[in-house]
Amino acid sequence: MNRAFSPFVKSLFVALLAVSAAASANQEKKPAHAEAAVVKADAGKGATLYAEGDAARGLPACVSCHGAAGNSTIAANPKLAGLNEVYLNKQLVEFTKPERNQPVMTGFAKMLTDAEKKNIAAYLAVQTPKPGAAKNKDTVELGKRIYRGGIAEKSVPACASCHGASGTGMPIQYPRLGGQHQDYTVAQLTAFRGGARKNSAQMSTIAMRLSDDEMKAVADYVAGLK
């Protein structure tokens, strides 16, 4: 038997339909308005900040330590040219955290805005790295064996499995090592082993299994990779 809806029920039904339609319309519009605009890194601004710093903030020019176009000539300071943009930005961010606290870089990184970090990373990523050279002929074979094959008895994997056969690395996750200063690479392995650098559990584990001589040998070999 058909029964007519009361005026109240009809009004309520219409109101619910209207609310449902409005909610649906808002849901459809959300993605367009909810998505925050992605700000693209400005390599030009990064180049200026890298070369000149910002005297007003007491921020020195990166070039004074890391060299023209990111090709450091100081063995203790890393070459940054050609490193992956995302990786570089990640390291600048991590310098502001306890996991990679470093006396010099932590202070500078904290002075940079998020945009400035990205700009510098974008600039360095497109620079051409200059080659290095292995210097110790007596240990180059040991370094080569460790880099290419690891040390099975110590459960040390081949460095090449993550950093590539020629040390070019893998974008974002594993940095370029080819041509890097031996002194810097040894310093980082030592920091991983001793706990001063804690932003990679994988590298900390590997470094703890390497002796000083093994670190020096593989770091010297890596310096000569092209």
Language-model regions, residue ranges each:
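The canonical Cys-X-X-Cys-His
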Residues: 59-68, 120, 156-165, 218
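The feature marks the first
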Residues: 41-53, 57-97
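Protein kinase-like catalytic domain
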Residues: 50-51, 66, 96, 147, ...
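Sequence context surrounding c-type heme c attachment/ligation sites in exported
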Residues: 47-63, 85, 89, 148-160, ...
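Electrostatic cytochrome c docking/interface patches
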Residues: 26-58, 126-152
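N-terminal export/targeting leaders of redox proteins
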Residues: 1-43, 93, 213, 223-226
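Extracytoplasmic/secreted proteins, especially bacterial periplasmic and envelope-associated proteins
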Residues: 45-49, 87-90, 104-107, 119, ...
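Axial heme c-ligation environment in periplasmic c-type cytochrome domains
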Residues: 26, 64, 73-81, 95-135, ...
